[in-house]
């Protein structure tokens, strides 16, 4: 019973089969991102991969990180890559001969990453039941209270307390507002520069 409650807390009440389907879809999209010969199509698969990962993170309760994936990776980085690739004239024939050479390296990197994660990440949730033997311990009480407090302090449901999102926003738009404007100008110059380069080549 305790194991079921723990698993339900991990997946935020959603069906674990849906999470498995999202994980499988993300793996397929990641493979197509590497294998695709067209860079524009590869970026589109990358956007789909980030979208699936963000949905997965939101469903397990990590809403801030999931929305950060949507805003940063999809809304800024991937769209900027797609914008630049559509402006630059890339010959597909130049990529066909060298694209397949990266597949063994990608497979080796994926196997290495899975091995490292398998050694470091705890896969057996029964090990957490060791806390049941310390029913009268002060450590168990404080540990449970800290877990419940961190789970209840969700930035999208509790708008009264100052959360990480509001703290970052207050610091970014008050103390570091000048640097935020500088970064925005640099991004604007990068976009205008890519347009000028592409127009110069056409002329």
Curated annotation (Swiss-Prot):
Keywords: Electron transport, Membrane, Mitochondrion, NAD, Respiratory chain, Translocase, Transmembrane, Transmembrane helix, Transport, Ubiquinone. The gene is ND6. It is an enzyme of class 7 (translocase). GO terms for molecular function: NADH dehydrogenase (ubiquinone) activity. The keyword Iron does not apply. This is NADH-ubiquinone oxidoreductase chain 6. Signal peptide: none annotated. It is a multi-pass membrane protein. Its main location: mitochondrion. The chain crosses the membrane at residues 16-36, 40-60, 70-90, 102-122, 179-199. Belongs to the complex I subunit 6 family. It is found in: Mitochondrion membrane. PANTHER family: NADH-UBIQUINONE OXIDOREDUCTASE CHAIN 6. Its EC number is 7.1.1.2.
């Amino acid at each position: 019973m305790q194991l079921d409650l723990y698993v339900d807390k991990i997946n935020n009440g959603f069906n674990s089969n849906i999470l498995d389907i999202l994980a499988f879809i993300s793996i397929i999209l990641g493979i197509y991102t590497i294998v695709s010969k067209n860079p524009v199509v590869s970026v589109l698969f990358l956007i789909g991969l980030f979208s699936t990962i963000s949905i997965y993170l939101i469903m397990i309760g990590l809403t801030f990180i999931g929305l950060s994936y949507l805003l940063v990776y999809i809304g800024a980085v991937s769209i900027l890559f797609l914008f630049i690739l559509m402006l630059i004239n890339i010959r597909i024939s130049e990529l066909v001969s060298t694209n397949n050479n990266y597949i063994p390296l990608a497979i080796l990197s994926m196997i290495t990453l899975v091995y490292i994660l398998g050694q470091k990440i705890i896969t057996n949730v029964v090990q957490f039941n060791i806390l049941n033997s310390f029913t009268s311990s002060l450590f168990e009480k404080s540990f449970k209270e800290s877990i419940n407090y961190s789970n209840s302090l969700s930035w999208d449901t509790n708008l009264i307390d100052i959360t990480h999102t509001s703290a970052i926003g207050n610091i970014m738009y008050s103390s570091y507002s000048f640097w935020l404007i500088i970064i925005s100008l640099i991004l604007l110059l990068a976009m205008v520069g890519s347009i000028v380069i592409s127009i110069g080549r056409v002329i």
